Swiss-Prot record:
Gene3D superfamilies given in the database record: D-tyrosyl-tRNA(Tyr) deacylase
Entry keyword Hydrolase: yes
Official protein name in the record: D-aminoacyl-tRNA deacylase
UniProtKB keywords: Cytoplasm, Hydrolase, RNA-binding, tRNA-binding
Gene behind this protein: dtd
Gly-cisPro motif, important for rejection of L-amino acids, short sequence motif: residues: 137-138
Phylogenetic classification of the source organism: Bacteria, Pseudomonadati, Pseudomonadota, Gammaproteobacteria, Alteromonadales
Keyword tRNA-binding carried by entry: yes
HAMAP family: Deacylase_Dtd (MF_00518)
InterPro entries in the record: Daa-tRNA_deacyls_DTD, DTD-like_sf
Length: 145
């Protein structure tokens, strides 16, 4: 399971001209599901995302996690993160989870974050989305479990 996280000062997702999710300070999480992923990996990754210390403390050091910084999550499904780009000029998605598996784990990720009290907004699974963000830093990390 892969989470490409970006520290943002604001981000939103638009589907069919309508804003369906938006946050101010927080993390934009692009979430990719691989064939071998399960609920245990989802929980481990969600915990890591929420606990990862990427927000600056009073000394300017990246030392605060999402809760400590008073941030929110915007979680967007992104199956292309599971692409194999090692050969040729076209990505292969043979390692990506099935749509059913990905939908289940994406929703479980969102539900887990909500259950921990994190303000969590979402995109729409498998929709054509327009994602806008203001990357703060920029600060971007690729987390994988």
């Amino acid at each position: 399971m892969i989470a490409l996280i970006q520290r943002v000062s604001e981000a939103n997702v638009v589907v069919d001209g309508e804003t369906i999710g938006e946050i101010d300070k927080g993390l934009l999480v692009l979430l990719g599901v691989e064939r071998e992923d399960d609920l245990a990996k989802m929980e481990k990754l969600a915990t890591k995302v929420m606990s990862y210390r990427v927000f600056s403390d009073d000394n300017g050091k990246m030392n605060l996690n999402l809760e400590q910084a008073g941030g929110s999550l915007l979680v967007v499904s992104q199956f292309t993160l599971a692409a194999d780009t090692g050969r040729g000029l076209r990505p292969s998605f043979s390692g990506a989870g099935t749509p059913e598996q990905a939908r289940e784990l994406y929703q479980a990720f969102v539900d887990f974050c909500l259950s921990k009290g994190v303000n969590t907004q979402t995109g729409e699974f498998a929709a054509d989305m327009k994602v806008s963000l203001v990357n703060d830093g920029p600060v971007t990390f690729n987390l994988q479990v």
